Design a protein with these regions (language model features):
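Surface-exposed, low-hydrophobicity beta-strand/loop segments enriched in small/polar/acidic residues
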Residues: 1-112
């Protein structure tokens, strides 16, 4: 357990339309004008969906956020991409540059 919390530091949240498949805590991508959807494996994501309601979702696009992970992430600056299950994984060929400040077996705290 960490003595420090990064929760909500620098959070920038925007509201998008979304499909019924979008759920809170999953990384999403822009699928059409003003609309987000779930990412496939290796997609570059735009942010992390909050709990969607009535066809819309708040999406955190900047700041510190906790995400689920596949595989391990290196602390410090890393390139990540969607893992196809709503989380992220290390990207060997591009991805999104993020600052990883905490990592465990199945989750990490990133600064987008």
């Amino acid at each position: 357990m960490s003595k420090f919390s990064f929760e909500d530091i620098g959070a920038v949240v925007a509201t998008f339309a979304c499909g019924e498949d979008v759920t809170g805590g999953k990384v999403v991508k822009v699928t059409e004008n003003g609309t987000v959807g779930l990412c496939s494996a290796k997609d570059k994501f735009c942010g992390v969906a909050m709990e969607p309601r009535k066809g819309g979702a708040a999406v955190q696009v900047k700041g510190f956020v906790t995400v689920s992970t596949t595989g391990s992430l290196t602390l410090g600056w890393a390139n990540v991409e969607a893992d196809g299950s709503g989380g992220v994984q290390s990207s060997a060929d591009g991805g999104i540059p993020v600052l990883v400040v905490s990592a465990s077996e199945n989750s990490a705290v990133l600064c987008l």
